[in-house]
């Protein structure tokens, strides 16, 4: 929940997607590495140096050139996938809570189609804080719905906010929705 636009009867939260600095850095590294491996493979096949560094034309095509070509193809496939995710801003969206109409609208950008979930306040049982520390920490806010076992996450994937900020956002949302707050120990 990157930004909150709060009024007395409405809360709007913008969710960031895959347009993160880390994805740009990894995408750039994959692009350079994938093209480099493909050029090294082609250089070993043709006997001409296509790279400014090193001397890949001296490599044997079998097995080094073929393996480098395979690495290049795999890297470029991952590279195209990652750049496509960045282009469509996968996972971005918004959460909208409207007290006057007693409705919740959750929108996310999907791979092939957008996700749009509309709920009434009556369907919400509580707001849950899902906090786990350790090797792969997770701090997210979710809605527990009546008749559904799994909570509906509201936070964006990969967001790691300070614990105090997550607790404050969860408490403010629970108070706004007039439901209980779960997950605090």
UniProtKB/Swiss-Prot annotation:
Belongs to the Ycf4 family. Its main location: membrane. This is Photosystem I assembly protein Ycf4. Pfam families: Ycf4 (PF02392). One of its GO terms (cellular component) is plasma membrane-derived thylakoid membrane. HAMAP family: Ycf4. The lineage of its organism: Bacteria, Bacillati, Cyanobacteriota, Cyanophyceae, Synechococcales. InterPro entries: PSI_Ycf4_assembly (IPR003359). Keywords: Membrane, Photosynthesis, Thylakoid, Transmembrane, Transmembrane helix. The keyword Transmembrane helix applies. It is a multi-pass membrane protein.
């Amino acid at each position: 929940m990157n930004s909150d636009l709060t009024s007395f009867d409405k809360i709007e939260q913008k969710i960031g997607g895959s347009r993160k600095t880390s994805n740009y850095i990894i995408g750039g590294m994959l692009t350079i590495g994938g093209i480099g491996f493909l050029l090294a493979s082609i250089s070993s096949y043709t006997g001409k140096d296509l790279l400014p560094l090193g001397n890949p034309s001296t490599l044997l095509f079998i097995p080094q050139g073929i393996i480098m070509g395979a690495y290049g193809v795999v890297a470029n496939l991952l590279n195209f996938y990652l750049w496509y995710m960045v282009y469509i801003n996968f996972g971005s969206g918004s959460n909208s809570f409207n007290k006057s109409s007693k409705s919740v609208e959750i929108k996310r950008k999907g791979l092939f189609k957008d996700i749009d979930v509309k709920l009434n306040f009556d369907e919400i049982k509580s707001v849950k804080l899902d906090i786990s520390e350790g090797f792969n920490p997770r701090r997210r806010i979710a809605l527990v719905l009546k008749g559904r076992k799994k909570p509906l996450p509201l936070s964006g994937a990969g967001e790691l906010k300070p614990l105090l900020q997550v607790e404050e956002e969860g408490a403010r949302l629970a108070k706004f929705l007039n439901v209980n707050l779960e997950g605090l120990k």
